[in-house]
Amino acid sequence: MRLNKSLHDFKKNHLRKKNQVIFRSLHCKNYYKVENLYKFLLAEKNSFIFESVEKGTTRGRYTIIGLDPDKIWDIRNNVVSLDNNGKIDKIKTNPLKYLNKLINEFKIEIPRKLPSMASMLVGYFSYDIIRYIEKIPNRCKDDLKIPDVRLSRPRNLVIYDNLKKKIHYIENIYADT
């Protein structure tokens, strides 16, 4: 199997503590084979699917599956919980400054042959995140018990390009793991 970089280049970048993307791309004209692969992958814990739907179309250019996050960040009540491969750390900090630092440190060079979403932080920001910015009374009962913010960093992505009929198998290698 041919990958996008040599072992020598990989080791050199790894020693420099540089985030890297390893990938393999294949032509796949039969979308039903891709759908079956997705059904299998989506059974994994903490996996997700995105469709890049535009202008009311049924299917957009890219179908993206992410799985196997190495880190998951939950923010709730000014506490960041970091799940680092099963090890949970609680960090009492300013959540907005922490998020800003996290996003600024998330630098990874995406090869031109790949879509820009080949490496990502994925998750949600709840409506209650506004309370970290403005002083708004919190009179509502918290009956959902979900974090104000949840972000994960998937190690593995499978991206199908519906236009070029190409599937990309991607492994993100992060220097801090």
What is each PLM-predicted segment?
Residues M1-T177:
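Signature of the chorismate-utilizing enzyme
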